[in-house]
Swiss-Prot record:
Gene behind this protein: nadE
Family listed: Belongs to the NAD synthetase family.
GO molecular function: ATP binding; glutaminase activity; metal ion binding; NAD+ synthase (glutamine-hydrolyzing) activity; NAD+ synthase activity
Chain residues that bind ATP: 46-53, 160, 189, 211
Binding partners and assembly: Homodimer.
EC number from the UniProt entry: 6.3.1.5
Keywords on record: ATP-binding, Ligase, Magnesium, Metal-binding, NAD, Nucleotide-binding
Described function: Catalyzes the ATP-dependent amidation of deamido-NAD to form NAD. Uses ammonia as a nitrogen source.
Database matches in CDD domains: NAD_synthase (cd00553)
TM region positions: none
Designated name of the protein: NH(3)-dependent NAD(+) synthetase
One Pfam family it belongs to: NAD_synthase
Gene Ontology cellular component list: cytoplasm
Amino acid sequence: MEIRKRILADMQVAETIDAHEEIRKSVEFLKAYLKKNTFLKSFVLGISGGQDSTLTGKLAQLAISEMRDETGDNEYQFFAVSLPYGTQLDESDRQDALNFMNPDNRLTVNIKASVDASVAALAEAGVELSDFAKGNEKARERMKVQYAIAAMHKGVVVGTDHSAEAVTGFYTKYGDGGTDINPLFRLNKRQGKALLKELGCPEHLYLKKPTADLEDNKPALPDEVALGVTYDQIDDYLEGKEVPADAAAKIENWFIKTEHKRHMAITIFDDFWK
């Protein structure tokens, strides 16, 4: 039980929430960051068409719109970036998500040429990437592009990581995990759905099965299959509810196994890994 106490303390998930209050909490958090760092003028976010980027994008646009209204400074902008590898299977969902969040700016950068070039260069050097490793290349290329856009617009990269994802470390280190600010952390998956429902999001965007969709050989592989545990079980665990012993063990194993992802590069003074 000690490990669960630690996880619950780290993940900060409330047993119940008020969706409207949590929306305002995230928006005010994003605005406060811009107000504190007055040299920053934009948010940049990669949009997949899934629940997490849809919610994060809507919150980011709300924050930017309010900053413009409050300051009269039209330099405040939100950049929603589509980053397909070739053709995305659920492109229609991404377009629905973009229409829902109505971002100031829509950009599309196809990462296929860049990823394939990296894979080919590594192969030429004698390093043949597995399909899984190539999937991580895609995630890191997407983040590289977002930071390039942010650099040109006085921006920061907004992350989609929430507590149900953070507890399992279900993201690529220095890929989708390598962001500047994460307005969803403290929420689990079902709570994110509640916020989207409150915001009037089309329900198919938050009822679809979550997938990282990184592997060529396993297209649209559901997160729950990859993790071996359901989001309902993860959410129950984070809310302090009873879950099957095998599910709890899997969640705790993921937490321990991926702890390095929740830290910057370790130094001689760090002891979490010992």
